[in-house]
């Protein structure tokens, strides 16, 4: 089976997406037929596999290529010889952050009826917004940390709204890769941390920061009616992974398995199933959990994990190919114009 990797995007995580695509190339190799790069101006470019390396993008060489136009059948390439349609195999949405995870690309691909692996519109909206993710989890009976949502209007009252003690962690409500994330240990650090977070999002989420909390990551997808899980990873970190650590982490080929009981692993999987069903059909996602006093809490849902979290799967290629055979289908609406014909008939 052949794939097309779509990456880049007008996002703070633009470079993360490039690194992610380069890493996935090393995993899937010649199964990737096309690499389609989306730049910050929403132009599409076809990138040769031989140019899929950091130096090429650092020098912005893709700007010398002719831009492509997305159509119902694939990508339209104009040249002096005339227009040519590049028919796309199954697309892997690997655009992190804005465009890829907020639902824009899902909307576009669904609109043009282009088959893709990735979160659909509703799944993107709920998982990209951390506050909405918490509401979604609560509705499913899954615990989340206490939290306060701030915007520019109420940020001046932050200390009155926060009902938990220092230290706490401040995050942009709609951003990933630890962009704009700070641990605040005393009040004098608050304004700077808020300024940093508001650079990336119009809203900011504040949660208690628990030093040394047990964290477990689990990736997976649903293939037909059965779930396919990765093994559970326990991130090796001190306070939290910053942007640079996550950025470099995508190149890894394997992650150490977590040492946890069968009972806890089953709990994580059951929570994953609740979160996935049926909202995330067609996507490989990663759920990050905390375990506090033997209780499982959802930290966040990553709808497009770095390099699709391939390093957590024992057989990623088979998982991807099986998922490709189990994608959700949007029913085609039949337009019969019967109402209009009836109006015409009655005239």
Swiss-Prot record:
Cofactor annotation remark: Binds 2 magnesium or manganese ions per subunit.
Coiled coil stretches, renumbered: none
Entry's Gene Ontology molecular function annotations: ATP binding; D-alanine-D-alanine ligase activity; metal ion binding
Biological or metabolic pathway of the protein: Cell wall biogenesis; peptidoglycan biosynthesis
Domain of life: Bacteria
Catalysed reactions, semicolon-separated: 2 D-alanine + ATP = D-alanyl-D-alanine + ADP + phosphate + H(+)
Entry-linked InterPro entries: ATP-grasp, ATP_grasp_subdomain_1, D-Ala_lig_Van_CS, D_ala_D_ala, Dala_Dala_lig_C, Dala_Dala_lig_N, PreATP-grasp_dom_sf
Positions that bind Mg(2+) 1: 288, 300
Listed cofactors: Mg(2+); Mn(2+)
Binding site for Mg(2+) 2: 300, 302
Role, per record: Cell wall formation.
Name of protein: D-alanine--D-alanine ligase
Organism, as annotated: Helicobacter pylori (strain HPAG1)
Lineage, uppermost ranks: Bacteria, Pseudomonadati, Campylobacterota, Epsilonproteobacteria, Campylobacterales
